[in-house]
């Protein structure tokens, strides 16, 4: 109807300014015309394009050591490192005015504080979203990977990502190790700090299916 058309036009105009204002009651009517994130208010500053080259450069430099400018988490540093890569690639932080750790994506150098989305794999993925592929085939998963992409896995298929890595290189050569065949790719990550090809003994992505029978990527 005319009301829906006007709402869609209004969002199309305001989205260029970084503001989405559609009411939840409208979403069920408009359906697939709008993304679910249309219920969120974003920064009025247009998003900068993600610079994969700078992100890859940062990942290579800091995969095997901690950057003293950031906090570190000995119990699990993968998302913290992924966030640093995102920042190096030009993604802008979104601060919560109240310092609410459940909102935004940010860290504070002075207090070493962070949002949950900065340091937890589950919340990082919920904040930035997932790709369209989820499945248990490591070969299919590897075929869709490209350099400059974040990757993750869910060990129990409960819908929450448990670990995040970052791809710095990819080739089209099929490898078979640890009982799985895949297209080889190179991962930079923390929580197991390395920068290595999956086929390398230093990288454990090829053996995950043995440790986690219900794993999905």
Per-segment meaning from a language model:
Residues 94-98, 163-164, 199:
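Short, solvent-exposed loop/turn and secondary-structure capping segments
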Residues 180-194, 199-217:
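Low-complexity, Gly/Ser/Thr/Pro-rich intrinsically disordered linker/tail segments
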Residues 79-87, 164-168, 187:
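Active-site scaffold segments
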Residues 106-185:
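...with weaker cross-activation on analogous glycine-rich loops/strands in unrelated enzymes
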Residues 1-49:
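Non-catalytic propeptide/linker segments at domain boundaries
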Residues 19-21, 69, 150, 164-166, ...:
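Ordered hydrophobic segments in well-structured contexts
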Residues 56-140:
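Secreted/periplasmic proteins that engage bacterial cell-wall peptidoglycan
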């Amino acid at each position: 109807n005319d009301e829906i058309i006007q709402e869609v036009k209004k969002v199309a105009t305001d989205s260029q300014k970084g503001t989405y204002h559609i009411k939840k009651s409208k979403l069920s009517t408009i359906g697939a015309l709008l993304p679910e994130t249309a219920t969120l208010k974003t920064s009025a500053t247009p998003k900068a394009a993600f610079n994969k080259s700078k992100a890859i450069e940062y990942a290579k430099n800091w995969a095997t050591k901690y950057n003293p400018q950031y906090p570190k988490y000995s119990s699990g540093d993968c998302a913290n490192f992924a966030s640093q890569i995102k920042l190096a690639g030009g993604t802008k932080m979104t601060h919560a005015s109240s310092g609410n750790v459940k909102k935004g994506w940010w860290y504070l150098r002075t207090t070493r504080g962070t949002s949950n989305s900065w340091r937890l794999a589950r919340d990082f993925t919920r904040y930035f979203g997932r790709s369209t592929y989820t499945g248990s085939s490591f070969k299919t998963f590897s075929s869709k990977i490209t350099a400059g992409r974040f990757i993750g896995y869910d060990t129990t298929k409960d819908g929450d990502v448990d670990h995040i890595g970052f791809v710095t290189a990819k080739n089209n050569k099929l490898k078979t190790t640890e009982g799985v065949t895949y297209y080889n790719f190179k991962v930079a990550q923390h929580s197991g700090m390395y920068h290595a090809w999956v086929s390398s003994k230093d990288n454990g992505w090829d053996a995950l299916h043995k440790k986690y029978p219900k794993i999905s990527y």
